[in-house]
Amino acid sequence: MSEYKQCIVTRDDLKLSKGKFAVQVAHAALSAAEWASKSDLEKWKEGGQKKIVLRVPTIKDLYELKEKARREGLPTALIQDAGLTEIPAGTVTVLGIGPAKEEVIDKVTRDLKLV
């Protein structure tokens, strides 16, 4: 039986407070989960809703990762900040990928570093 997980990918080039970082990760987790198939979402929930937070150096890397995930058929959510506190409105902060089968997500994220 396959395991399911979700990855949230952040940008190293943005310097966010811990609170802002946590909120952006939460937005990505929820938004990406809303795009998952009902079956994958249920299996992920049954397995404990495994999440991993990873990082990429730049926004360019984030967009490239989103495209890789799209080619694998993975649900994604690119999060843009509202600009009310620390960073300008529209700043792309994080990418949520999954939930989906771990082996499919790993094809896209295996070379990334943990936060």
UniProtKB/Swiss-Prot annotation:
CDD domains: PTH2 (cd02430). This is Peptidyl-tRNA hydrolase. One of its GO terms (molecular function) is peptidyl-tRNA hydrolase activity. The keyword Hydrolase applies. The lineage of its organism: Archaea, Methanobacteriati, Methanobacteriota, Stenosarchaea group, Methanomicrobia. Its main location: cytoplasm. It is found in: Cytoplasm. Pfam families: PTH2. One of its GO terms (cellular component) is cytosol. It catalyses: an N-acyl-L-alpha-aminoacyl-tRNA + H2O = an N-acyl-L-amino acid + a tRNA + H(+). The gene is pth. SUPFAM superfamilies: Peptidyl-tRNA hydrolase II (SSF102462). It comes from the Archaea. Transmembrane segments: none annotated. InterPro entries: Pep_tRNA_hydro_II_dom_sf, Pept_tRNA_hydro_arch, PTH2. It is an enzyme of class 3 (hydrolase). Its EC number is 3.1.1.29. Keywords: Cytoplasm, Hydrolase. One of its GO terms (biological process) is translation.
